[in-house]
Design a protein with these regions (language model features):
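PRPP-associated nucleotide enzymes
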Residues: 1-123, 127-190
Length: 190
């Protein structure tokens, strides 16, 4: 998606440790117009898949998931990274390693909101090593819900997570795919 790629080149910051900072428009300060365009593009990619629900993980995926959900006319369910007192004891749970934060979290969703037969589109802001997608897919598997695919805003294609999951048969549509990235050379898209 050229609009997104142009914005990444303009305002994204490549930092040491293979980190792309897009906090000025994706995952801290949200450019609602841009994320709505991303949501619209994801709708066009998945509109024929009869989505019942969008699933994401807190916190950075929530904004774009909500904007995409407006186009699909479906609710958004987000996996929490910690079980809180306002969620029932009846939950699906999976472990997810975070590339950005360098830790492992237990993610949970209430069994009240993820149901057998649901047709789920997973949406997230980044795809690097694939751990978040694997965890979200596992929650759906536990619920006997069907993952119809994943919509990703930015994929670090060179880290291999997306290619591994595609090889397993998962449909993944990424709006911006980064072929390589470094502080010295900047960003090259696929």
């Amino acid at each position: 998606m050229k609009l997104l790629e142009d914005r990444i080149l303009k305002d994204g910051i490549v930092a040491q440790g293979d980190v792309l900072k897009v906090s000025s428009f994706v995952n801290h300060l949200i450019d609602v117009e841009l994320m709505d365009e991303c949501g619209k593009e994801l709708y066009h990619l998945f509109k024929d898949d009869h989505i019942d629900k969008i699933l994401t993980i807190e916190a950075s995926g929530i904004g774009v998931a909500c904007l995409a959900a407006r186009h699909f006319g479906v609710p958004v369910l987000f996996a929490k990274k910690a079980k809180s007192s306002n969620i029932s004891n009846s939950v699906y749970t999976a472990k997810v390693a975070s590339f950005t934060h360098g830790n492992v979290s237990d993610i949970v969703v209430s069994k009240d909101f993820l149901n057998k037969g649901d047709r789920v589109l997973i949406i997230d802001d980044f795809l690097a090593n694939g751990c978040a997608l694997i965890g979200l897919r596992e929650l759906c598997h536990q619920a006997k819900a069907q993952v119809v695919g994943a919509g990703i805003i930015i994929e670090k294609e060179y880290q291999g997570g997306g290619n591994k999951l595609r090889a397993e048969g998962m449909r993944i549509e990424s709006l911006a795919k980064i072929k390589s990235m470094s502080v010295e050379d900047g960003i090259e898209f696929c």
